[in-house]
Amino acid sequence: MTFPLPLDHEHLQKLVTADLVRPDHLLGAHPTTEHGVQGVRFAVWAPNAQHVSVVGDFNDWNGFDHPLQRLDFGFWGAFVPAAQPGQRYKFRVTGAGGQTVDKTDPYGTFFEVRPNNASIIWQQDFEWTDAGWLEQRARRGQALEDPISIYECHVGSWARRDDGWFLNYRDLAHRLGEYVTYMGYTHVELLGVMEHPFDGSWGYQVTGYYAPTSRLGSPEDFKYLVNHLHSLGIGVLLDWVPGHFPTDEFALAHFDGSPLYEYADPRKGYHYDWNTYIFDYGRNEVVMFLIGSALKWVQDYHVDGLRVDAVASMLYLDFSRTEWVPNIYGGRENLEAIAFLKRLNEVAHHMAPGCLMIAEESTSFPGVTTPTPEGLGFDYKWAMGWMNDSLAYFEQDPIYRKYDHHKLTFFNVYRTSENYVLAISHDEVVHLKKPMVLKHPGDWYAQRADYRAFLAMMWTTPGKKLLFMGQDFAQGSEWNHDAPLPWFHADQPDHRGVMNLVRRLNELYRERPDWHTGDAREEGMAWISADDTDNSVYAYARRDTYSGAWSLVIANLTPVYREDYVIGVPQGGEYRVLLSTDDGEFGGFGTQQPDLSARDEAAHGQAHALHLNLPPSSVLVLEPVAAAPVKGLVSRQELTPELREVARQSAQAVQVERAADPRPNEQQRLVAETPAHEGGRSAPADAAESAEQKPDDEQKGGKKA
């Protein structure tokens, strides 16, 4: 429960100078008592407005009953005794040009169910029981050496009621919690939570940055969801969109009749791809609005982290546009956005210890997960390069894969440059891209076998994991945000096999330190064989960076049975099977290994060798029976000259791309020298900036429309 601060000069000045990180404690609608009278204090930022009043159920939407008083620095406020929790309201704003528009509260914590959009006065009251979880989260911190397996879930379409309406957050809590616990995920990442008017935006065109969508219930219902998942040991992450906002007249757009939350110049402030506006990161009140939103979720709603959407669109002034305005150095980086992101991550980590800040950043921008001040300060970054290379490889007919063998080895060249999440997200199963299992070539059996191999390689490759809902039971259709998942698939043997595999992968990932402690370390993975291009076979070891315990991964990525295949190993003795994607439990044939004794023969630079039978399109994971620390594993440098040349050319291509403008070292210098936001422009209280503004982001449209 929060209490409003006095609307005095000192507190308003702190907001203007970016010293008040929770502006929602000052602005918005706050039930309170003044001079012994109960009512609601309303406050809003509209520096260029001619007149502002609050209208709602308490005054029959009459704009003359409760005018707001103009305060210092462009703020307006009033105490309304007639107002009470549960009533609807809006701000009636007469802008600089004389036009009057009813606006929803930017700091509103609850809204009507779409298509209606009025804000609702809300007295939040919830008894949390997750203090132990929050203490553990703070101790865990960045969790670089912990297993993190994320189940990405769209709250509006994971499941529905029998009548087709959305589940309540409380119902979702129990059903989702039971499923995620059974499958062994450590976290859920929820999209579509923050209030948005258009279902087809998937929640990526936000109008309520401080409010969970009312489609699924009240703020207390959402708190119940988070609290219940914490009781099951499941972390909760949210998708958060500080890169752009919709042009709907009732919300943030031209809030006081002029560009306010958005850049005034359309070359900086308008996303042509998505028909959305870009936040003005140079304006303190806007920066604090966004940082306050982030803190609302990680503090008040106990959320464990935010996946920041479309970071690339924020970083580059020329992102998806031909006309753009250079920064003060003549470059294409948005220095104000860089400063904002650094301040955001610093404040979030300080105010909510242990919360994870994850960037969806699709370029080679340096230092995304480097701590501030040298870097942006995120904890993790999505591995978009790994995703693109892996899908491009697995979508090919196996007969041609030998020509792109490097696509599955290249990630290891740069995997320690950032802290990565290997993400197969909602973006990969929409817009005719096909569901994951159907991306693979061949008949239905071949597709499932190949998909199982992909999943096993994903879970044994260094990096945290994220898988979108439905893909863990091989959903046979693209995601439809207007319909629940086809859960009947989960009861069919073909789909159940993939589901069993993901469950087993999560189990091994959580239990085996060699599968997660070295995610961000060079020694966490070593190639045994990275150059068998003709057979499309890969072999690598995962190693616990503390005990030295290790496991061996062998992937046969063609539909060819390979008998007596030789793999070098550093340790003699007996081995056992930890996992085979060809097991009958997973939908395979159940190929057996007749002999798992290492022979004293040299292979792949190792002193011993195993002779294995490799099932078609499969991954086999082994461990030595007599576990012993092993340090002499062949590293990724152990590539053939041909593969080294391919890797060199690929790396060179990345450098050429980085050199576009400016060079990477210049970019790194700019990042390091750009301080976290310390107070940029504050909005003038009497004069509006001219021009329009409209930005561009990553790719929203149907995706995030």
UniProtKB/Swiss-Prot annotation:
GO MF assignments: 1,4-alpha-glucan branching enzyme activity; cation binding; hydrolase activity, hydrolyzing O-glycosyl compounds
Catalytic activity: Transfers a segment of a (1->4)-alpha-D-glucan chain to a primary hydroxy group in a similar glucan chain
Listed GO CC annotations: cytoplasm; cytosol
Composition-biased stretches (Basic and acidic residues): 691-705
Active site: 309, 360
Pfam families noted in UniProt: Alpha-amylase, Alpha-amylase_C, CBM_48
Pathway the protein takes part in: Glycan biosynthesis; glycogen biosynthesis
EC number: 2.4.1.18
A biological process term (GO) from this entry: glycogen biosynthetic process
Location of region: Disordered: 654-705
Record keywords: Carbohydrate metabolism, Glycogen biosynthesis, Glycogen metabolism, Glycosyltransferase, Transferase
NCBIfam families per the UniProt record, alphabetical: branching_enzym (TIGR01515), PRK05402.1 (NF003811), PRK12313.1 (NF008967), PRK14706.1 (NF011294)
Known partners and oligomeric status: Monomer.
The family this protein is said to belong to: Belongs to the glycosyl hydrolase 13 family. GlgB subfamily.
Role played: Catalyzes the formation of the alpha-1,6-glucosidic linkages in glycogen by scission of a 1,4-alpha-linked oligosaccharide from growing alpha-1,4-glucan chains and the subsequent attachment of the oligosaccharide to the alpha-1,6 position.
Protein name as it appears in the record: 1,4-alpha-glucan branching enzyme GlgB
Species this chain originates from: Deinococcus radiodurans (strain ATCC 13939 / DSM 20539 / JCM 16871 / CCUG 27074 / LMG 4051 / NBRC 15346 / NCIMB 9279 / VKM B-1422 / R1)
Designated gene of the protein: glgB
